[in-house]
Design a protein with these regions (language model features):
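Glycine-rich NAD(P) Rossmann-fold beta1-alpha1 loop
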Residues: 25-26, 48-58, 127
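Glycine-rich helix-loop-beta junction characteristic of Rossmann-like nucleotide cofactor-binding loops
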Residues: 34-38, 112-115, 135
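Adenosine-nucleotide cofactor-binding segment
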Residues: 46, 62-129
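NAD(P)H dinucleotide-binding glycine-rich loop of Rossmann-like/cofactor-binding domains
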Residues: 1-48, 96-97
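Glycine-rich phosphate-binding loop and adjacent beta-alpha segment
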Residues: 72, 81, 128-179
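Short hydrophobic alpha-helical segments of the AMP-binding
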Residues: 57, 61, 160
């Protein structure tokens, strides 16, 4: 292997952790900085915040100076997100949602996001969680589509016009191969 392809394992990390660090943290750095333009003092919503890229987004969001709201599916996962640095947590119900449940989740997201909404939403989950999250985005916010294990999201694009926001796909592997 060329030396340029090697990375030093961070102190305190096992080889098993090291094997996943490049993918999870590389994806997340690309998402938050290159695609989401996250800046100090902004508000970040992380869906699936206890998964690999979700926890990376919580940790990196805090390191970049953002207020981080972590959305997860259980109290145990909320505790993991808090341990990673989340300022606030939301425990959401499991999908699928009916219309009332979707509205209720959007209200939870909005309440936690505050008056201005979220500057950046990091979504590695998709499915029924995407629309309620998009409804909580702030003016000119950035919605990052990182994955969709809960299903391909269906978003009403009129929301992007009403919020003057961006929806960005994040595919770090293709980005890294092209650059």
């Amino acid at each position: 292997l060329p030396t340029a392809s090697l990375y030093r394992l961070p102190e305190g990390r096992s080889f098993a952790e090291g094997a996943s660090l490049l993918l999870t943290y590389g994806t997340t750095i690309h998402a938050l900085l290159d695609r989401g333009h996250l800046a100090e003092g902004q508000t970040l919503l992380v869906l699936g915040a206890a998964g690999g890229v979700g926890l990376a987004a919580v940790e990196l969001g805090k390191a970049f100076g953002a207020r981080v709201v972590a959305a997860v599916s259980s109290e145990e996962k909320a505790e993991a997100a808090r341990q990673a640095g989340a300022d606030d947590t939301i425990v959401y119900a499991r999908a699928p949602f009916d219309k009332d449940q979707s509205k209720a989740l959007a209200e939870q997201f909005k309440e936690a996001g505050g008056k201005g909404g979220y500057d950046v939403i990091y979504d590695p989950v998709g499915g029924d969680y995407a629309e309620p999250a998009l409804r909580s985005i702030g003016w000119e916010g950035r919605y990052l589509v990182v994955g969709f294990p809960a299903g391909i999201p269906k978003l009403p694009l009129n929301l992007t016009l009403l919020k003057s926001c961006d929806v960005c796909g994040v595919f770090w592997g293709a980005f890294a191969a092209r650059d």
